[in-house]
Amino acid sequence: MGRCFMIRQKFRLKEYDWSVQVYYAVDCYYTDEIMEDLYSIGCRGKNLSVAFNNLSSCKLDTGLTYSNYSTHETVMVIGINSSAEEFMNSFCHERKHLEMHIAKTFNLNPWGEEVAYLSGKIGQKMYRIAKKFLCGHCRKHLIYGYS
């Protein structure tokens, strides 16, 4: 297998004045870059240490989401996954963390319609890239650069 190619995506949730940086297909090669991004949005101490251990472990099927509630910024990482099903698992898991961080910040009812719409909006923003990881052939091409 060749070098993995990480994909970056930035998007904004205007309704909440919230900026999101997503890293897809992450392996430990990108640890320093992502650590700098986490630090730049205020990640410190134990959270930064846990993130470093996660990113540098080189494990498949992992991810992380860190949000700065004051500045409304999030860094989300979806690591390289062993299958399309595992990608879907990580995608839903990390998206849910983002949803909960925003809901907590704005005191949204976790069982209410606004959170349900927020979840859908996040999914829509991520769909353009995420959909490519749900196709086995597409995943291999994206991650390893071959067909």
Labelled PLM ranges:
Residues 109-141:
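Post-HExxH zinc-binding segment in Zn-dependent metallohydrolases
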Residues 4-59:
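Non-catalytic terminal regions of proteins
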Residues 89-101:
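Active-site recognition of the HExxH zinc-binding catalytic motif
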Residues 41-85, 98:
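Active-site scaffold of zinc-dependent metalloenzymes
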Residues 101-107:
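Short helix/strand-bridging catalytic loops that position acidic/His residues to coordinate divalent metals
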